[in-house]
């Protein structure tokens, strides 16, 4: 990344352009790290995951059908930065560019007067991942859709993972980072319990969880998770032989999400679950300041 930005600086790119490129690539590397991917082995399928990741990063919104913090225009700019980075890497190290391009017709009004003679060759390159630059609407998930989704999961671990997302509004990485010692003792005389000071975007916050779900987690830990020997205490770990005991990755959770969705024809991403939970709180008449506290918003 340093070499690429240095190359861009040598081409007299504006300082703001260099800052934007650095920010875009930092976001991309955060996704790679969260997913366990290596930058030189990224495939087009992983780029599609990255687009979902970008959309799911809108965390500080409380409104029904609010547009994403990252507009589709911003997402396209980030993809353009990554495409140019891989073009540079392809020249330097012969790394394949995972952002595939195809030929498209230029819109007529994009032709300037001096280019009128070139209309017969009116083609330009465009990423196959380019998203429509209109407001991205959050998809609210119904109880029936979620029950159908959960019914198709075959692992107790996965059912609990997605219940945590749907019933608490937690971010996916917050759930993946939950540790056994953070689980409060089940007290069925209470409706809600609190996971104190969980990891959240480089900081910490409290996570409020239905007591019935805390009981399910506690039973799962005692009956299944504790049977897997690890040198860490993450609740959600891989159960595959080759990766046994390693912290469950964003990639694994994403793959499971998409696999089940293909079977039931119900489409949503991780952040849709968070936004659905938030929207349900707002619709119930809860004070917005309380909703912000529950969702872990700073302001």
Regions of interest found by a model, annotated:
Residues 2-16, 25-114:
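N-terminal core-binding DNA-recognition domain of tyrosine recombinases/integrases
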Residues 21, 161-162, 169, 173-178, ...:
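Alpha-helix N-cap/helix-start motif at helix boundaries, enriched for small hydrophobics
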Residues 97-143, 239-244:
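Flexible interdomain linker/hinge and immediately adjacent N-terminus
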Residues 133-172:
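Basic, Lys/Arg- and aromatic-enriched nucleic-acid-binding interface segment
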Residues 146, 157-159, 250, 254, ...:
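Short, leucine-enriched amphipathic alpha-helices that occur as contiguous helical runs
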Residues 173, 177-215:
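Conserved tyrosine-mediated DNA breakage-rejoining catalytic core shared by Y-recombinases
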Residues 211-266:
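Active-site/catalytic core of tyrosine-dependent DNA strand-transfer enzymes
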Residues 254-293:
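Short, basic (Lys/Arg/His-rich) helix/loop patches that form interaction surfaces
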């Amino acid at each position: 990344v340093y070499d690429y930005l240095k190359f861009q600086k040598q081409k007299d790119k504006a300082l703001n352009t260099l800052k934007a490129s650095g920010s875009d690539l930092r976001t991309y590397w955060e996704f790679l790290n969260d997913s366990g991917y290596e930058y030189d082995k990224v495939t087009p399928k992983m780029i599609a995951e990255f687009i979902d990741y970008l959309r799911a990063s809108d965390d500080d919104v409380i409104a029904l059908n609010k547009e994403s913090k990252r507009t589709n225009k911003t997402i396209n700019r980030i993809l353009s930065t990554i495409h140019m980075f891989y073009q540079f890497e392809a020249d330097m190290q012969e790394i394949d560019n995972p952002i595939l391009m195809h030929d498209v017709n230029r819109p007529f009004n994009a032709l300037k007067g001096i280019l009128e003679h070139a209309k017969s060759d009116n083609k330009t390159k465009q990423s196959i991942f380019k998203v429509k630059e209109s407001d991205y609407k959050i998809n609210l998930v119904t109880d029936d859709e979620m029950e159908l989704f959960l019914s198709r999961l075959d692992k107790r671990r996965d059912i609990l993972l997605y219940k945590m997302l749907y019933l608490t509004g937690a971010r996916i990485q917050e759930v993946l980072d939950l540790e056994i010692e953070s689980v409060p003792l089940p007290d069925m005389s209470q409706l809600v319990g609190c996971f104190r000071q969980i990891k959240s975007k480089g900081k910490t916050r409290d996570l409020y969880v239905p007591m019935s779900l805390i009981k399910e987690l506690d039973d799962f830990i005692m009956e299944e998770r504790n049977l897997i020997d690890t040198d860490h205490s993450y609740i959600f770990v891989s159960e595959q032989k080759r990766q046994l005991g390693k912290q469950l990755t964003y990639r694994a959770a994403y793959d499971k999400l998409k696999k089940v969705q293909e079977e039931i024809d119900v489409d949503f991403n991780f952040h849709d679950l968070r936004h659905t939970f938030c929207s349900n709180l707002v619709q119930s008449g809860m004070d917005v300041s309380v909703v912000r506290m529950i969702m872990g918003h700073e302001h």
